[in-house]
Amino acid sequence: DSSKDVGKLSASWAQYCAQEELQKLSDKNKIELTLFHGRGGSVGRGGGPVYTALLSQPPGTVNGRTRITEQGEVIQQKYDTASLAENSLGTYIGSVFEATLIPPVKPKQKWRNVMDEMSKVSAQAYHSNIMDDQNFLRYFDEVTPQKNLEKLFIGSRPTRRSASKDIKSLRAIPWMFAWTQMRFILPAWLGILEALSDTCLLYTSPSPRDSI
């Protein structure tokens, strides 16, 4: 949900760092930590291959345990039949085993420096286009079916957190649902181009691709 506030790249990196800190605290206090992931059907809300998602978690944070919820729109796609359900659950179990037994490489400090810079630039670009642009709300209302979706009352919670009509009050689910209806998944990529471009300018030796 935090990707709605700062963009997917910045939100993902912040979540990664937070998971690392939680793991350190749990290890220090000898607590078994189980991280909960509320995965979305859309890429903008965490959707995507389960295998790559679990294998991209910080080393040691899966540790044989995880808790995941699937969004309602993907239940039929993954669990409609016994064979589908068996395959989906098998993917989860296998991914947890692999992430536990063969965890990913711990990020080097220079990798973290790159990600910190990319996260900063991405968040700034995202905010300048969405939160700071006075014309964006009008654009959003005109190009997406959000105004009509609000009248359907199809969600389990209100569309907005308050009576305000600004972007901040809109919940993440209707935000993504509106973009998905027009096949324009802006929240999944906005700000990433600026982050990559900035990184290529800063880290030019030996190769921007190697740094990234």
Which residue ranges define each predicted feature?
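Extended, hydrophobic alpha-helical segments in both membrane/secreted and soluble proteins
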Residues: 15-22, 33, 43, 47, ...
